[in-house]
């Protein structure tokens, strides 16, 4: 394969001077390479030792992701509930419906969940079948990154990049959950692989395939997939061989493919009449386009929040925490700023090797400037550099809803530069070896800080520092030699790679030893006593070892047994306010309607529409605890109508005690249609700007009355929101929060 001898940069190139030499004509001297190794993609030789090692790295990733996978239960209960429903009917599968009756969908396109639902259909619905697709996707992403880096920078670089990627804790975490991030990660890495293929083969079809891969990433997690596209597109623009005008046309075509794939599901959904399909969760008008461009799309970047509408299961906020641990994690990203990704929640998940990645980028940039050549290495450097820069800046300063595990999207680019750094160090001159040694020293300091900040596994920091120190000494002792021999170079690079991966590997392996949160996946040693906090100080449960599942509250099992016995022709056995109340029942196979979607804020129901469902025999029972979702005022208004119109079911009827909040609306359709919808009742809960309960004493009593331990202090500090009893109590007590009987805007734990 020829990289520069057949065609010079065209004369109309607007990015690089037309007189830049080709790779074979350029001066080979640069900052850390004396001479520069030949820039030729290394062919893929099947059956070779390098191929076996690449597969071994991918296998390591798969083992890490799949080891004791069933201890994580069903992962994120919100998504697990939808997967159960998607196995029930192909209609639910197509739309990504939360419930088997297809009343409302998930608040994301179903791309990633199609894979999980297919797995559940083939292997049966179980913990393994739900979580295995993510494990496989993460392992495939590792393999593709290894190949992508190896083709341009050599076998050593590819293997080091793959190992660094596989052992990044957040990669292991998302690979062991049913969140869509592993599928997104595979999609964008595949797009980078296709982009690199397009640059080296000079075939535009690979660039079109890159657009398609990014499009599927959009179908998995909306616009976040677009964060990698500027880097990929710019890498092709500066390094591909066709004339500049053709390159631009190629990128326009790739963007068109991206748009076509991205909008395919949106078009299919929105062309179907609203009466014939489920409401699109997370939208303001029931349309898929609004989901993509609204709160869940552009709103995530601008800081927009969804309605904190009446609904159960949300996360109260605005209180000081009461925990005594020194290491706490804000699962919502913490304070914005340039150092955000080094905070407690993200630093030990993705930033272990940041100094090496930064120095490697600068070295690769210097190489490109010195060589003045448009080739595959320039494209690779720009592609991964743009990916890392755009993603880091957006994640550091985004004001919208943000979770720590989102940084998995940054991991492939950082790992690529670890591999690139290994290649440059292997072929480096004296100056390059000095820079490599300095980057190792910086990495050792960072790793010691990250380990000791957590307050456990302190020996890991010491061991990593010693190993890195030995590798630094090894590099320094070679300075007397102008060049490294091949054997000494590989030994130096290999020792350094092993040394810097000790700490992240320990964190990754530790993450497999105990159950992980389905809602907030991470990989780190189990922290005794609980060390995970939420904004406003809502204390965590059992720390990083918290049990599987999400915020699922749930319906009492005795109540569900009674409701099942009452079901005749009804499509839904009961309607509740939010997915957090419905998830456990949906996972068990019951058809429960979550009127307000994820957090109870979707406006899907009115008294008239409820009356129509009752007349059609599709719904009979309503659960009013926590109110029903909708825009401000409408949810609590519907709850008021149901309470005043339908017949209450005493808890003793189904073997419970206290107030059940269950109502029988059979035969009440006429009264429901005639009932006025009152405004939200704010007299008992005046406006509260900080999102806390207007009457903490009443909130504490409400929690106790609903079977939960009393929160301490001035808020719910120290409670475990993954405990179903706690979640049910929070749902029942939502009316004591400001804003008309609702959680404050953005307080419900957005996913």
Tell me the role of every PLM-derived stretch:
Residues 2-435, 442-446, 510, 598:
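Membrane-integral, polyisoprenol-dependent glycosyltransferases
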Residues 3, 428-529, 553:
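Transmembrane helical bundles and short interhelical boundary loops of multi-pass, membrane-embedded
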Residues 44-48, 321-347, 545-569, 691-698, ...:
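Intrinsic low-complexity, intrinsically disordered segments
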Residues 79, 111, 128, 191, ...:
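Stable alpha-helical elements in mature extracytoplasmic
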Residues 88, 120, 172, 514, ...:
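Sec-exported extracytoplasmic/periplasmic mature domains
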Residues 276, 284, 514, 604-613:
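Alpha-helical scaffolding within the catalytic cores
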Residues 502-600, 615-641, 646-665:
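Short periplasmic/luminal acceptor-recognition loop of GT-C membrane glycosyltransferases, typified by
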Residues 675, 679-751:
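Cell-envelope/extracellular polymer assembly enzymes that use nucleotide-activated donors
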């Amino acid at each position: 394969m020829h990289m520069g001898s057949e065609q010079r940069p065209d004369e109309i190139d607007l990015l690089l001077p037309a007189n830049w030499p080709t790779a074979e004509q350029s001066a080979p001297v640069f900052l850390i390479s004396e001479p520069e190794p030949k820039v030729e993609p290394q062919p893929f030789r099947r059956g070779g030792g390098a191929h076996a090692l690449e597969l071994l790295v991918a296998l390591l990733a798969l083992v890490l992701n799949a080891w004791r996978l069933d201890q994580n239960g069903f992962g994120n209960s919100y998504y697990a509930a939808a997967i159960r429903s998607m196995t029930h009917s192909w209609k639910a599968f197509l739309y990504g419906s939360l419930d088997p009756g297809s009343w409302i969908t998930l608040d994301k396109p179903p791309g990633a969940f199609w894979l999980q639902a297919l797995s559940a259909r083939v292997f049966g619905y179980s913990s393994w079948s739900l979580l295995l697709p993510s494990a496989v996707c993460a392992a495939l992403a590792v393999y593709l990154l290894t190949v992508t880096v190896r083709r341009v920078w050599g076998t050593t670089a590819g293997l080091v990049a793959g190992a660094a990627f596989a052992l990044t804790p957040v990669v292991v975490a998302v690979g062991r959950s049913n969140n869509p991030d592993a599928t997104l990660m595979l999609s964008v890495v595949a797009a980078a692989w296709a982009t690199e293929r397009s640059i080296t083969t000079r075939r535009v079809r690979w660039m079109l395939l890159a657009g398609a891969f990014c499009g599927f990433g959009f179908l998995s997690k909306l616009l976040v997939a677009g964060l990698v596209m500027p880097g990929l597109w710019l890498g092709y623009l500066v390094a591909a061989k066709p004339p500049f005008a053709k390159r631009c046309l190629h990128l326009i075509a790739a963007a068109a493919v991206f748009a076509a794939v991205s909008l395919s599901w949106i078009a299919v959904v929105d062309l179907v009449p609203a009466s014939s399909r489920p409401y699109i969760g997370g939208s303001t008008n029931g349309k898929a386009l609004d989901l993509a461009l609204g709160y869940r799309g552009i709103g995530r970047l601008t800081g927009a929040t969804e309605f904190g509408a009446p609904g159960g299961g949300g996360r109260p906020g605005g209180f000081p925490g009461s925990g005594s641990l020194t290491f706490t994690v804000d699962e919502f990203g913490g304070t914005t700023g340039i150092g955000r990704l080094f905070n407690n929640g993200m630093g030990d998940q993705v930033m272990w090797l940041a100094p090496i990645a930064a120095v490697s980028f600068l070295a690769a940039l210097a190489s490109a400037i010195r060589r003045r050549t448009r080739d595959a290495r320039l494209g690779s450097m720009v592609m991964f550099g743009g990916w890392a820069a755009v993603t880091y800046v957006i994640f550091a300063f985004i004001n919208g809803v943000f979770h720590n595990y989102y940084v998995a999207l940054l991991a492939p680019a950082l790992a690529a530069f670890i591999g690139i750094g290994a290649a440059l160090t292997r072929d480096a001159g004296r100056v390059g070896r000095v820079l490599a040694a300095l980057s190792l020293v910086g990495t050792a300091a960072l790793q010691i800080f990250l380990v000791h900040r957590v307050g456990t596994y302190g020996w890991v920091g010491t061991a990593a520092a010693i190993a890195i120190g030995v590798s630094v000494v090894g590099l320094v002792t070679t300075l007397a030699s102008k060049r490294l021999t091949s054997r000494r170079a590989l030994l130096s690079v290999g020792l350094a790679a092993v040394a810097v991966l000790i700490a992240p590997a320990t964190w990754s392996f530790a993450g497999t030893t105990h159950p992980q949160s389905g809602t907030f996946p991470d990989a780190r040693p189990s922290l005794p006593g609980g060390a995970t906090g939420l904004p406003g100080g809502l204390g965590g449960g059992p720390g990083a070892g918290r049990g599987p599942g999400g915020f699922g509250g749930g319906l009492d099992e005795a109540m569900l047994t009674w409701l099942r016995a009452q079901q005749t022709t009804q499509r839904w056995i009961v309607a509740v306010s939010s997915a957090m109340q419905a998830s456990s029942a949906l996972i068990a196979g019951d058809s429960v309607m979550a009127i307000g979607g994820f957090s109870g804020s979707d406006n899907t129901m009115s008294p008239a529409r409820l009356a129509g469902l009752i007349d059609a025999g599709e719904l009979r029972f309503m659960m009013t605890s926590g109110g029903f979702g909708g825009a401000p005022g409408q949810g609590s208004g519907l709850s008021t109508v149901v309470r005043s119109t339908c017949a209450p079911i005493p808890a003793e009827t189904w073997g419970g005690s206290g107030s059940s909040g269950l109502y029988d609306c059979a035969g009440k359709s006429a009264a429901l249609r005639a009932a006025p919808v009152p405004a939200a009742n704010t007299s008992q809960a005046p406006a509260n700007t900080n999102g806390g309960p207007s009457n903490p004493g009443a909130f504490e009593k409400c929690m106790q009355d609903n079977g939960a331990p009393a929160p301490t202090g001035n808020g719910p500090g120290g409670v475990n929101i993954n405990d179903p009893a706690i979640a049910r109590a929070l749902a029942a007590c939502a009316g004591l929060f400001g804003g008309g009987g609702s959680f404050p805007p953005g307080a419900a734990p957005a996913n």
